[in-house]
Regions:
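Exported/periplasmic ABC-transporter solute-binding proteins
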Residues: 1-34, 39, 43-50, 58-68, ...
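DPxDG-like acidic metal-binding loop motif
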Residues: 55
Length: 232
């Protein structure tokens, strides 16, 4: 069985895992998938690692394009996602319907899980800047809990380590037992676009092309939507 290597952001993992399995069954090609935040994967590529297909944030793909590491014209927008708040299923849901209500919910909670900014996850970096801008960083810092780098914030809801979790919506939905409170309100939110591409030097460009075509299919779009992403 031939093999196709894929570097994919965890931002699409909730949808892509099943889609990748479907591709393996239909194509007979084994996928060797490495999951991580876009910055984690970019660091591995900078260190000399390679893949056939990439699924990253648009910023990640563009950074690689500037280095000549993505086949020109191969990039395709797949879906986009915003940042959401989740609680453990059945727990009280705070009001986050306006920026002020969101701010008060953060101040009132006992603990909140988010991605560690140093790991480079888009939502974690954004949240650190957001609470500074809102003037509540000092009040929140003792409450913030981090999963392992590349991990899922909602997992800390299940262990009782966090009362709220903040991350890309599909990443929150990846954890069974989490429940979405809502998206961050209005212009407080951050929208991330996820893009696929073929890495320069791929040993299986035909397989990578076929995978990307499948990820654009109407069936794939339905899966993206069901998992909290907005299909392109």
């Amino acid at each position: 069985m031939s093999e196709l290597t894929v570097f994919s952001t965890i931002g699409v993992r909730s949808a892509a895992e099943g889609l990748f399995q479907s591709y393996e069954k239909s194509s007979g090609i084994k996928l060797a998938v490495t999951w991580g935040t876009a910055p984690m994967l970019l660091k591995r590529i900078d260190g000399g690692e390679t893949a056939d297909a990439l699924v990253l944030s648009r910023a990640g793909i563009e950074a690689l394009q500037q280095q000549g590491k993505v086949v020109a014209g191969s990039e395709v927008a797949l879906a986009s996602s915003g940042v959401a708040i989740a609680v453990k299923r059945g727990a009280p849901k705070p009001d986050i319907s306006t920026p002020e209500a969101f701010k008060q919910a953060l101040l009132a909670c006992k603990s909140i899980a988010c991605s560690e900014p140093s790991a480079g996850g888009a939502s974690g970096v954004y949240f650190a800047k957001l609470i500074e801008r809102m003037g509540i960083a000092d009040a929140l810092k003792p409450k913030i809990k981090y999963p392992p780098p590349g991990g899922f914030c909602a997992a800390l809801l299940m262990t009782g380590e966090a009362e709220l979790a903040l991350q890309q919506k599909p990443e929150l939905l990846h954890i069974e037992g989490s429940e979405i409170v809502g998206m961050l309100p209005g212009d407080v939110n951050l929208i991330t676009e996820f893009v696929a591409g073929i890495m320069s030097g791929s040993k299986n460009t035909d397989g990578a092309k076929a995978l990307i075509v499948m990820l654009q299919s109407s069936a794939a779009k339905a899966v993206f939507q069901a998992k909290g992403l907005e299909p392109a």
